[in-house]
Structures are given as C-alpha cells and as structure tokens.
A protein has these predicted regions:
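Conserved active-site and cofactor/substrate-binding residues in soluble primary-metabolism enzymes
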Residues: 28-31, 35, 121, 125, ...
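Structural signal for hydrophobic packing residues in well-ordered secondary-structure cores
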Residues: 37-44, 134, 138, 215
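Short terminal or interdomain "cap/linker" segment that borders an active site or interface and mediates
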Residues: 92, 141-220
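Internal, well-folded beta-alpha domain core
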Residues: 108-168
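Short Cys/His-rich "knuckle" micro-motifs
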Residues: 222-224
Length: 224
C-alpha cells in the first residue's frame, strides 16, 4: 500500500475563504485568512495512503478480501466502465484539531473558524496531490482516472465508511471512525477513484465533479 507524505508548502487561501463561507465578503481582512493558512500549515502532519483493487462495475463489487459491495446508485453511475478502483485516505493530523478546539475554548472564535476552514482546504489539497502522484503511474498502465468520490456524496451511505477504512488501510496513517461514522482526526478524508481505459469510457473525464455534481445549491462553500 503506497504511502504519501509530501509536505504542504502552502495552503490555498482562496479555498480557505470559500470553506469559511466568505466568498462574498470582499471586505474581510485577507491577512487573517493568510495567517490562519500559515498557522495550519505549520501544525499539519500530512499523510496519505492508498490501495488499488479490481472492480466489477456490473455488480458494483470491489474484489477485495472479503469483497465489498458498494451501495447506492450514484457511486455505481460514477464508476461505470471502471476496471479498477483506488481506495485512499488522507489526513492532516490531530494537532490542528487540538489547536482549533483550544481557540474556541479561549473565545478566539474568528481565528478558530478560519483555521478550521484552512484545515479543510489543506486536507483536500493533500488529496489533490495524491491524485496527481497516482495519475502518471496509472497512465503508464493504460488507465485514466475519475475524480474521487467519498461516502456521503449523493446516495452513497456513510455506513460504508468502515469498508473504505479497511480497503484504504487508513488506520496505518492514524485515521479511524467514531461510533457515528465520522472520521478521526476530523480533518481526514476517505474516497474511491475509478480507473478506466479511455476506449471504454471516452466521456468520463467530462462528467461533473465537486460542487457541479452536488445537489446542495445554497451551500455557502459552493464554488462560483
């Protein structure tokens, strides 16, 4: 199982602003966002891990040991035409979460919210970096990739998080689940990436992703 430990050299302040719901707050102090991004970067302990499996798109089954039957129509549609899937997990560690909690407890609400948003941007950025590292390896084997899809997207139930934790071997980087199926450390993700051969799924790269694929039209973090 490949492990990804590339450092975060910076955190995208525009993404942190978006996650904080400040896209329309043009007069908000940009320096505070940049400060939150830098504080987060210094505390981050970025780690990622991934594993590749054969996939049967007809039955929505990941051929692991034991096999994993994916539930939900949306994930099945998303992985249509895929021969393999990559199960991945990424985290920026616990130190950020502890600092955010400390700031809330001491009444530093604004900085805590901004740091929470920066941490979300950081873990997504980490996962983006993993995808970029994976892509050429898969391309060398004749595969293109779809964008990552996580439990909770569409109708893919959070109840399948334990399966994804197992498939990605996420506990090896310290990512676990609470009894309510939430990831810990909180700024962590799990996801599947579908792999397909272009002649079998020539339009896959044009399928909607992220905010464009989400039904929450009024989300304050929605990309413009």
């Amino acid at each position: 199982m490949p492990v990804y430990n590339a450092p975060l050299l910076s955190i995208d302040a525009a993404e942190a602003r978006r996650y904080a719901g400040l896209q329309k707050a043009a007069d908000f102090n940009e320096g505070k966002i940049l400060e939150a991004c830098e504080d987060t970067r210094l505390l981050a302990k970025p780690r990622g891990i991934w594993e590749i499996y054969d996939y049967d798109c007809e039955t929505q089954t990941i051929n692991a040991h034991p096999p994993c039957l994916l539930q939900g129509k949306k994930i099945g549609q998303h992985l249509a035409g895929c021969e393999k899937v990559i199960a991945l997990s990424a985290t920026v560690g616990e130190d950020i979460e502890e600092d955010i909690t400390r700031r809330f407890s001491s009444g530093e609400y604004s900085s805590a919210v901004l740091m929470d948003a920066a941490a979300t941007a950081a873990v997504e950025q980490l996962a983006d970096g993993m995808e970029k590292a994976i892509s050429p390896k898969m391309a060398a084997q004749g595969f293109l990739r779809k964008w990552r899809f996580s439990p909770g997207y569409g109708d893919w139930p959070l109840e399948q998080q334990p399966e994804l934790i197992r498939l990605a071997k996420a506990e090896q980087i310290g990512v676990k689940l609470t009894t309510s199926m939430m990831l810990t450390p909180r700024k962590s993700i799990t996801a599947l990436i579908g792999l397909y051969r272009k002649q079998e799924n020539s339009t896959a790269e044009h399928s909607p992703k992220g905010c464009a694929a989400c039904t929450q039209k009024n989300c304050p973090s929605r990309r413009k």
